[in-house]
Amino acid sequence: MASATLPAWIKMPSFLKKILKLRGRRQEDESRSRMLSDSSTQSYQVNQLTSEGTEAGSTIPSTPSKGQALPTESKVRAREKSRHRRPKIIDQVRRVESLGEQASQRQKHMLETLINKIYTGPLGEELVQTLYLRIWAMEETPESLKILQMREDIRDQVLKMKTERWLRTLIRGEKTKLKDFQKRYEEVHPYLMKEKVEQIIMEEAWSLAAHIVQE
């Protein structure tokens, strides 16, 4: 086919002008469609990659950070530490019902007999009178004031119960010897230095229970 560009002196027929014009318009349309197609393809690929990246990121399991694991580990350690902690002597002193149960049969019988006399016989009356006078004569403390201001029958019962507690604290174990007796006093000595009323009651209990101790 002859070139679409003709010399200026040749007059182009009108039908040829139409053909060239249609061809040019068709080429422009094809070029524009290719550009749009390429642009759509690239956009689709980018969106697909972004979507895949988002989905992949959402499926990655989250792992607890080191800082989050520390509280759990510290709780476990604290629990184990408290499990192996030895009971304090003062905790044992305050649990009357669990004391004195492991004494030898002979000592246990003598201990229960002594406690029964404290609650029911003249020994108990003599004990509470001695304790009352010693507490009255001591340096004033909140605990001593509390006891001295009690009604007499209530005060006597409280002093007897406190004496029983100390008796069961001092006389316990398979067999209590004098060295065990003294060792238990040393165990509670720091507590008694702060609680003078308890010290007086413990000393009277010591005196009452001395005959039970095996040499």
From Swiss-Prot:
Cite the residue spans of the region called Disordered: 12-34
Q: Name one GO cellular component term.
A: host cell cytoplasm
Q: Does the keyword section mention Cytoplasm?
A: no
The UniProt annotation puts the region (Involved in self-degradation and in host STAT1 degradation) at 15-22
PTM per Swiss-Prot/TrEMBL: Protein Y1 is produced not only by alternative initiation, but also by proteolytic cleavage of C'. Only alternative initiation is detected in vitro, whereas in vivo cleavage seems to be predominant.
UniProt subcellular location: Host cytoplasm
**Does ATP-binding show up as a keyword for this record?**
no
Q: What is the effect of changing residue 181 to S?
A: In strain: Isolate MVC11; avirulent mutant
Any one GO BP annotation for this protein = symbiont-mediated suppression of host JAK-STAT cascade via inhibition of STAT2 activity
Give the quaternary structure. Answer: The different isoforms interact (via C-terminus) with unphosphorylated and phosphorylated human STAT1 (via N-terminus), favoring the formation of parallel STAT1 homodimers. The different isoforms do not interact with host STAT2. C protein interacts with L protein; this interaction has an inhibitory effect on viral transcription and replication.
Q: Which family does it belong to?
A: Belongs to the respirovirus protein C family.
According to its UniProt entry, the function of this protein is described as: The different products prevent the establishment of cellular antiviral state by blocking the interferon-alpha/beta (IFN-alpha/beta) and IFN-gamma signaling pathways. They inhibit IFN-alpha/beta induced tyrosine phosphorylation of STAT1 and STAT2. Blocking the IFN-alpha/beta pathway requires binding to STAT1 in the cytoplasm. They inhibit IFN-gamma induced serine phosphorylation of STAT1. Block the IFN-gamma pathway by binding to and stabilizing the parallel form of the STAT1 dimer, further inducing high-molecular-weight complex formation and inhibition of transcription by IFN-gamma.
Per the record, the domain comment is: The disordered region at the N-terminus is involved in C protein self-degradation in trans. This self-degradation of C protein may play a role in the regulation of viral RNA synthesis. The disordered region at the N-terminus is also involved in the host STAT1 degradation in order to counteract the host innate antiviral response.
Q: Which additional comment does the entry carry?
A: The C protein is found in virion at a ratio of approximately 40 molecules per virion, presumably associated with the nucleocapsid. The P/V/C gene has two overlapping open reading frames. One encodes the P/V/W proteins and the other the C/Y proteins.
Task: Provide the protein name.
Answer: Protein C'
Q: Which organism is it from?
A: Sendai virus (strain Ohita) (SeV)
